[in-house]
Amino acid sequence: MPEHPPLQLDPRQRAMLAEMGVRVWLPEDAAPIPQEPALAYAAPAPAAAQIASKAAPVRAAPAPSVAAPAASQPAFNPGPRPQVQTLDWPALTQAAATCQACSMCQGRKNTVLHAPAVVGQTADWLVVGEAPDEEEDRQGAAFVGDAGVLLDNMLAALGLKRLALQGQGAEPESAPTEPAHSAYLSHALQCRPPAGRSPQLADVAVCRAYLEREIALVRPKVILAMGRLAALAVLSDQPALLAQPMGKQRGTLHRFQGIPVVITYSPYYLLRNSAEKAKAWLDLNLAADALASA
């Protein structure tokens, strides 16, 4: 893979990257080794009182109680697969909110699929995450909390901001944003997985119909797939690629229906692994270069 030339960043971009913890060209400082706290030792117990001459009577131990068997959960009967190929935004968001085509719907509060605040608004960038967490499920929005702040900073360093969506504090009559400076944010899965339930390939396949319709409506010129589930949803027709570790999937261009696709790490992963932020920044620049040369 060809090496990228040194990044040409102005002072504002460097300040933005420093704020989110990205050190361009410099390795991340090694994390300090936490000092293990000294073990607290208990004081010796006082000497036992004089032993009584007569032993206390021995009582039989009570028989262990047997827990009643847990009631079995009723089997989930999935509904029909979503048929959303021709839906407009209002119908698409309603279909996602009421979808019961897989068991991901069992514990959700909200889906994260929303229409742009301005009817017909498009965006040159589409950013796809993995699955909603608890806070995203509560708010009904993709990329919130610290991970959302990190992603917003990364996008801002490229002169981008997330597209305002309905139901997220934006009024429908808000002024449109230039598509070249906008990023539409979504997830591979629209529902938060129920507790103790990991997403399966079949779940991603069900939700892919929504993602493909979002792509058709947003009309992005470049797609950033952040995380394994995102890559699986966007590039499901490339199993050999998806079988490779993330380190080999990223750093190069892929295609979805002719649209450039760049795979990179999820912002949630980057919060736990700061040393990978510089690689993610290179991936964003790769996507920006692909868009500029399109």
Please report, for each region that a protein language model flagged, where it lies by residue.
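A polyanion-binding, active-site-adjacent surface
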Residues: 2-294
